[in-house]
Design a protein with these regions (language model features):
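Generic beta-strand/beta-sheet core signal
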Residues: 4-6, 31-34, 49-51, 157, ...
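Phosphate/diphosphate-binding loops
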Residues: 19, 25-29, 33-36, 73-93, ...
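Long, contiguous, secondary-structure-rich segments that constitute the structural scaffold
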Residues: 78, 83-129, 196-209, 213-317
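Long, low-complexity segments enriched in small/aliphatic residues
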Residues: 109-200
């Protein structure tokens, strides 16, 4: 059984085609607990509605901020939508797992968490909705805030990390690019989505960004349909020639849903499932690919017109 929550693995995980084959297994019972019908939810046997931040309690801290904020629901939960706390508490109870009664609902869980806080912070948070830690409100690096090293300096060569890295912290590694797959594929964040969140709102096709020199070498122009591929899969989408791109590097936004490309694959279909040497994270920006032209598209209405010598059958899989 697979229970998916706070995640959209069909489009956010490396080696996308392999992930989709796994989701398609007949012996896998999948439950997706989400706010919208994501690409992952389309593979689910059961879809459970989750609350949004407008319907639940939470504790939040934004990037770059030291303040803790209390999030309170603006509306009642819509229809049958439930929060993570409610769903997992009931799941645990049904599985016979003992759960503290203080975690039965969002407000109770919130009170349990704040009980462990210093009185001043707890009072400020519950009464005013925001808590400021007992440090200067505008900390300045190397004036009143320092790295946690013995000498309070930045350590560029920590011995513990050097020992943990299989090849050493700063060992040279050759570029994995090859003659068959010479281009670096990056999948940067955009102002359209937060990873894959809000991906359902994107109406237009995503475009591949490529430097003019790389485009000329492949007889590509803005508006052409590009086939981006390697040994793992392929992605089909329009191209935009962009002089701001680095030569040898192409870009396709991260967080895309299947509807944002012409064949339903995203950049993660070209990313291997190898792990980083430190932290065991995914290597999302380590893919090497090749790009060829397939057709021409009007980027305003996104209608296709195939160029001489390009077979429409190439778009059918």
């Amino acid at each position: 059984m697979l229970f998916v929550y706070n995640c959209n693995p069909a489009v956010t995980m490396p080696d996308q085609n392999r992930v989709l084959r796994g989701l398609a297994r007949e012996d896998l019972f999948t439950v997706v607990f989400d706010q919208v019908l994501t690409d992952s939810a389309r593979w689910a046997d059961v879809v459970l509605p989750a609350t949004t931040f407008l319907e639940q309690y939470d504790l939040a801290k934004s990037y770059g901020s030291v303040n803790l904020q209390l999030v309170q629901p603006a509306i009642e939960a819509v229809a049958d939508a439930r929060s993570n706390v409610e769903v997992f508490t009931e799941l645990a109870q049904r599985l016979g797992i003992e759960v503290s009664s203080s975690f039965a609902t969002d407000p109770e869980a919130l009170m349990h968490i704040t009980d462990a806080m210093p009185d001043a912070i707890r009072h400020s948070l519950l009464q005013g909705g925001i808590a400021t830690p007992p440090i200067p409100t505008c900390p300045v690096q190397f004036v009143d805030v320092f790295p946690g090293t013995p000498d309070r300096k930045i350590d560029f060569f920590p011995k513990s990390l050097d020992a943990e890295a299989p090849m050493g912290l700063y060992a040279f590694q050759s570029d994995p690019a090859s003659e068959s797959y010479p281009l670096v594929l990056l999948s940067p964040a955009t102002d359209k989505t937060i990873t894959s969140t809000l991906g359902e709102l994107r109406q237009e096709l995503a475009t591949l960004q490529m430097h003019p020199d790389d485009a000329v070498a492949r007889s590509l122009n803005t508006g052409d349909i590009a086939l981006i591929f390697n040994e793992l899969g392929e992605v089909q989408c329009p191209i935009t020639v962009n002089a701001n791109m680095k030569r040898g590097t192409i870009g396709l936004p991260k967080g895309l849903w299947k509807k944002s490309t012409m064949n339903g694959s995203t950049a993660n279909a070209l990313v291997q499932d190898t792990l980083t040497d430190l932290g065991a994270g995914a290597c999302f920006n380590d893919a090497r690919v090749q790009v060829t032209r397939m057709a021409t598209v009007n980027l305003k209405d996104q209608s296709l017109s195939f160029r001489t010598g390009t077979s429409a059958s190439k778009l059918v899989h």
